[in-house]
Each structure stands twice: as structure tokens, then as C-alpha cells.
């Protein structure tokens, strides 16, 4: 039997664990001094490929990134 007293504080605040861990990671990165801060910010970038499927076959993949296009 689970008790409400054992609920993690991030869940009690209405957050998911992923959003909580992202906030914690941002706080840690902001506390770093240079050059470690610049290195951490470059590792933060995410790139991924997205393919739509039609008739059971993947279409041409589209490369996406979380960084804004310049």
C-alpha cells in the first residue's frame, strides 16, 4: 500500500521526472565556470531524424535539431 507521504516532491509539484531532471541539469550547467560551461552547452544540443511512413515504407528522413536555425 503506497502512502501519499512517500510521493516524490517533483510528483507532488505536478511535474514529470523528465521535466524535473531537465530543470536540475539547467541549474547545474548555469553554475559551471568557463570553459566547462561552454563544453556542457555544446553537449546539450540534440539532433534526430524523423521519417514518415506511407504504404508500409519509410519516406525520406528529415533531420531535426533543437537548436534554432540561423
Swiss-Prot record:
Localization terms from the record: Mitochondrion; Mitochondrion inner membrane
Keyword Lipoprotein (UniProt): no
GO CC terms in record: mitochondrial inner membrane; mitochondrion; nucleus; proton-transporting ATP synthase complex
Pfam families reported for this sequence: ATP-synt_Eps
List of residues that carry N-acetylalanine: 2
The keyword Ion transport is assigned to this record: yes
CDD domains (UniProt xref): F1-ATPase_epsilon
Keywords attached to this entry: Acetylation, ATP synthesis, CF(1), Hydrogen ion transport, Ion transport, Membrane, Mitochondrion, Mitochondrion inner membrane, Transport
SUPFAM superfamilies: Epsilon subunit of mitochondrial F1F0-ATP synthase
UniProt xrefs under Gene3D superfamilies: ATP synthase, F1 complex, epsilon subunit superfamily, mitochondrial
GO molecular function, one term: proton-transporting ATP synthase activity, rotational mechanism
Family, similarity comment: Belongs to the eukaryotic ATPase epsilon family.
Function (record text): Mitochondrial membrane ATP synthase (F(1)F(0) ATP synthase or Complex V) produces ATP from ADP in the presence of a proton gradient across the membrane which is generated by electron transport complexes of the respiratory chain. F-type ATPases consist of two structural domains, F(1) - containing the extramembraneous catalytic core, and F(0) - containing the membrane proton channel, linked together by a central stalk and a peripheral stalk. During catalysis, ATP synthesis in the catalytic domain of F(1) is coupled via a rotary mechanism of the central stalk subunits to proton translocation.
Subunit field text: F-type ATPases have 2 components, CF(1) - the catalytic core - and CF(0) - the membrane proton channel. CF(1) has five subunits: alpha(3), beta(3), gamma(1), delta(1), epsilon(1). CF(0) has three main subunits: a, b and c.
Protein known as: ATP synthase subunit epsilon, mitochondrial
Amino acid at each position: 500500500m503506497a502512502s501519499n507521504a512517500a510521493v516524490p516532491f517533483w510528483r507532488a509539484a505536478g511535474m514529470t521526472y523528465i521535466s524535473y531532471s531537465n530543470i536540475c541539469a539547467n541549474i547545474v550547467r548555469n553554475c559551471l565556470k568557463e570553459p566547462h560551461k561552454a563544453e556542457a552547452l555544446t553537449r546539450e544540443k540534440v539532433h534526430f531524424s524523423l521519417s514518415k511512413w506511407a504504404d508500409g515504407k519509410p519516406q525520406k528522413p528529415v533531420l531535426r535539431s533543437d537548436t534554432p536555425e540561423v
